[in-house]
């Protein structure tokens, strides 16, 4: 029987399945950070249980960390407690931790892939909704809650029901300057922010194959923003070349044997999906969100939509509420909308390819007066690579702030946040009300588009910036 990639991954990890029972899955990798793990470790301690597979569990600090200093006290009392608890828990339970002073420290979904913790064919979980990122490698990766974190720590398994399947095919070739961020925002604009609910999405098509691993990670990272459980891209030579030689990747003959297995991780001819969505890459322009969910998105050349243009009453009401919160008027060109802050970073867009794209725009230019622009590399290795290439100097000379690794302004859990009413061009993944700070207004864009907004002071079409 022909199977989809998701079905192959799921079936390969079923430990036990009984009629009318939720299947029990084996978990290959468990990623841990400071925010969703303290209660889980407390649960182990209360029941005198060890971590079942400490060698398959990897921890880092990211959500709460300061991006201006490595001082654990810098982000406030709650952040300090959570980070100190993580240090204590990892020491006690034998879990490898990339703490503030470790060269590999960074955002959990950047650290995992770059250290070879993430490999094709695996099941990967983390107490974080954007765990879908790792699906770029052909791994079944999804976020879990704190009680599930405890269950995986204790048993290396998790009860998980089968999801529906969705194929999103992006055909043709994207125009120069169009990135994975533009592609995935265009997809969410088509499906809506709940269009993938109950599904695991497989991204395919020529435009997807043409993406680097960084681009595929951006794509899968935002699968959750269309309501999907997880996102997948079947592994290929691009995947194998990225993984080869990384710290935790197989070596020598083991790697060659692994690749032979990984090559089987693709949807069979004749396999059927519950839902199919198609887009043409050449029709995708640079994207900017205008509302308060990622599905409220338009091309940079478009005007702010009129709520009256939405036939669905729920969408119309949502648009009215979003425009009121965002302080926008229908009919205004996006390129007339001024910004206060720019954030280049997050688990969506903080990898070396993202920073190169932003630096290309920033080079020889200056951040517009009155704009604060932050560049936050996703990990220690990304920061070191960027500095080796001189990207930090380009940013600093242009007036951007070059920061230490962390989740930063993606979410208001550290010192990097918006003030009420401030408008931000952000490369992160969520533009919900208050996501970047109470009353803050978030517009999601690609790194190049964020840099363009920084140097012009408003949204600008990257294709028109020479």
From Swiss-Prot:
Top-level taxon of the source organism: Bacteria
One GO term (biological process): L-leucine biosynthetic process
Cofactor needs: [4Fe-4S] cluster
Enzyme class of the recorded protein, top EC level: lyase
Keyword presence, Mitochondrion: no
MF (Gene Ontology): 3-isopropylmalate dehydratase activity; 4 iron, 4 sulfur cluster binding; metal ion binding
Enzyme Commission number(s): 4.2.1.33
Keywords: 4Fe-4S, Amino-acid biosynthesis, Branched-chain amino acid biosynthesis, Iron, Iron-sulfur, Leucine biosynthesis, Lyase, Metal-binding
InterPro entries the record matches: 3-IsopropMal_deHydase_lsu, Acnase/IPM_dHydase_lsu_aba_1/3, Acoase/IPM_deHydtase_lsu_aba, Aconitase_4Fe-4S_BS, Aconitase_4Fe-4S_dom, IPM_dehydratase_rel_enz, IPMI_cat
Cofactor note: Binds 1 [4Fe-4S] cluster per subunit.
Pfam families in the record: Aconitase
Associated pathway: Amino-acid biosynthesis; L-leucine biosynthesis; L-leucine from 3-methyl-2-oxobutanoate: step 2/4
Catalytic reaction annotation: (2R,3S)-3-isopropylmalate = (2S)-2-isopropylmalate
Quaternary context: Heterodimer of LeuC and LeuD.
Family to which the UniProt record says this protein belongs: Belongs to the aconitase/IPM isomerase family. LeuC type 1 subfamily.
Protein name, UniProt field: 3-isopropylmalate dehydratase large subunit 1
Organism: Salmonella typhimurium (strain LT2 / SGSC1412 / ATCC 700720)
Gene this protein is translated from: leuC1
């Amino acid at each position: 029987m022909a199977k989809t990639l998701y079905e192959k991954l799921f079936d390969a990890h079923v430990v036990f399945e009984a009629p009318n029972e939720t299947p029990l899955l084996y978990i290959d990798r468990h990623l841990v950070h400071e925010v969703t793990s303290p209660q889980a470790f407390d649960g182990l301690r209360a029941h005198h249980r060890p971590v079942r597979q400490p060698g398959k569990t990897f921890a880092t600090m990211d959500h709460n960390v300061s991006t201006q200093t490595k001082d654990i006290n810098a982000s406030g009392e709650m952040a300090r407690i959570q980070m100190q608890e993580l240090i204590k828990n990892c020491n006690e339970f034998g879990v490898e931790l990339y703490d503030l002073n470790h060269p590999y420290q960074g955002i959990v979904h950047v650290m995992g892939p770059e250290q070879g913790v993430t490999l094709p064919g695996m099941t990967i979980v983390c107490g974080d909704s954007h765990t879908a990122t790792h699906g770029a490698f052909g791994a079944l990766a999804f976020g879990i809650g704190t009680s599930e974190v405890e269950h995986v720590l204790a048993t290396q398994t998790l009860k998980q029901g089968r999801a529906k399947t969705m194929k999103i095919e992006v055909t043709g070739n994207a125009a120069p300057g169009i990135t994975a961020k533009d592609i995935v925002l265009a997809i969410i604009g088509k499906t809506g922010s709940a269009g993938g609910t109950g599904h695991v999405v497989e991204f395919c098509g020529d435009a997807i194959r043409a993406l680097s691993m960084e681009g595929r990670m951006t794509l899968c990272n935002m699968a959750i923003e269309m309501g999907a459980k997880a996102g997948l891209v079947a592994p290929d030579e691009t995947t194998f070349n990225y993984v080869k030689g990384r710290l935790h990747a197989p070596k020598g003959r083991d790697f060659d044997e692994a690749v032979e297995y990984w090559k089987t991780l693709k949807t069979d001819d004749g396999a059927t999906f519950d839902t199919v969505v198609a887009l043409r890459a050449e029709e995708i322009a640079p994207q900017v969100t205008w509302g308060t969910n990622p599905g409220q998105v338009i091309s940079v050349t478009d005007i702010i939509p009129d709520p009256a243009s939405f036939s669905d009453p729920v969408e119309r009401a949502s648009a009215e509420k979003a425009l009121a919160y965002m302080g926008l008027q229908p009919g205004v060109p996006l390129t007339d909308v001024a910004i206060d802050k720019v954030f280049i970073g997050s688990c969506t867009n903080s990898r070396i390819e993202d920073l190169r794209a932003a630096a290309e725009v920033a080079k020889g230019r200056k951040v517009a007066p009155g704009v604060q622009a932050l560049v936050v590399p996703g990990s220690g290795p990304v920061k070191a690579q960027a500095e080796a290439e001189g990207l930090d100097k380009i940013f600093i000379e242009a007036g951007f702030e070059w920061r230490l690794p962390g989740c930063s302004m993606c979410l208001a859990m550290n010192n990097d946040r918006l003030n009420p009413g401030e408008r931000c061009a952000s490369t992160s993944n969520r533009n919900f009300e208050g996501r970047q700070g109470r009353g803050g207004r978030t517009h999601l864009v690609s790194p190049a588009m964020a840099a363009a907004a920084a140097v012009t002071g408003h949204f600008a079409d990257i294709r028109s910036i020479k």
